[in-house]
Each structure stands twice: as structure tokens, then as C-alpha cells.
């Protein structure tokens, strides 16, 4: 096997491993700061599932520079239920020396089919936010 063939074989293997790291049954998130038209890197996202009358923490991740978290609960297998993502926004704006109204944003949603991928984006400004189920 020549050097180029070996390089391409290793690259293909690495890409396959990387692509399969996040399962289909997962929750991802994306935070966009619409006040500046940019991704919001460094925002902590806490993930919870409701069990009986309590919330059990299943993950804690920070958005990357591109504002994304590929998998908010990598150590938890999704099951049908009610979930909550808490986007901790105050430190993000404090680091920018910007006053904000919301110290955090909670998004509560139901998962009925735990085999699907769920994407929960948040568009954010110091004075408001919006969220939706993405793809």
C-alpha cells in the first residue's frame, strides 16, 4: 500500500469514527446572538429529564465557537419523556460587557420517539429570545 492509499484509508476511517460519535437518538443545540448576528460560543447548556416530579440532570456542555453543541447529554440514552434545556446566558453577555434581561433561558419539550434526533436552537439578544425545533 503506497503512502497516498494509506493516507486516504486512515482519513476515511477517522471520518467514519467522527461521524458515528453522535448517535441519531440525541439532542443537539445551537445558540445564535441575533443582536450581533453571530454564533454565541461559550454558553453553558444544562440538560434535564423529568422523572416523577423532579428534574434529573443528564448533561452539561458549553457551546463551541460556532455556537453549537452536537450532543447535550452524551452519557444518557434518550427515552420518551419531558426534557429541559437551560441555556445559561448571563455570563455570555457579562463577558461582552452587555447588560441582559434574562440570566438564563429554559426550554421544556416532549420527546415521544426516542429514536429521533432533536435539535433545539435558541436565537438570543440581551432583551429577548426565540426557540424552535430544528433539524
From Swiss-Prot:
**Gene3D superfamilies the UniProt entry points to:** Transthyretin/hydroxyisourate hydrolase domain
Identify the Pfam families for this entry.
Transthyretin
Q: What InterPro entries does this protein map onto? A: Hydroxyisourate_hydrolase (IPR014306), Thyroxine_BS (IPR023418), Transthyretin/HIU_hydrolase (IPR000895), Transthyretin/HIU_hydrolase_d (IPR023416), Transthyretin/HIU_hydrolase_sf (IPR036817), Transthyretin_CS (IPR023419)
Claim: Iron-sulfur is one of the keywords in the record: no
Q: Give an example GO biological process.
A: purine nucleobase metabolic process
Q: Signal sequence span per UniProt?
A: 1-20
Describe the family membership recorded for this protein in Swiss-Prot or TrEMBL. Belongs to the transthyretin family. 5-hydroxyisourate hydrolase subfamily.
Protein name, UniProt field = Probable 5-hydroxyisourate hydrolase R09H10.3
Amino acid at each position: 500500500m503506497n503512502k497516498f492509499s494509506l493516507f486516504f484509508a486512515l482519513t476515511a476511517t477517522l471520518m467514519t469514527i467522527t461521524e458515528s460519535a453522535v448517535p441519531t437518538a440525541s439532542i443537539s443545540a445551537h445558540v445564535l446572538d441575533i443582536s450581533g448576528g453571530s454564533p454565541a460560543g461559550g454558553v453553558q447548556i444544562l440538560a434535564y429529564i423529568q422523572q416523577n416530579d423532579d428534574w434529573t440532570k443528564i448533561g452539561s456542555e458549553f457551546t463551541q465557537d460556532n455556537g453549537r453543541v452536537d450532543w447535550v447529554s452524551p452519557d444518557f440514552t434518550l427515552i420518551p419523556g419531558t426534557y429541559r434545556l437551560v441555556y445559561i446566558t448571563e455570563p455570555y453577555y457579562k463577558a461582552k460587557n452587555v447588560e441582559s434581561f434574562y440570566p438564563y433561558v429554559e426550554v421544556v419539550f416532549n420527546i415521544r420517539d426516542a429514536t429521533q434526533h432533536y435539535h433545539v436552537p435558541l436565537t438570543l439578544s440581551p432583551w429577548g429570545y426565540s426557540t424552535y425545533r430544528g433539524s
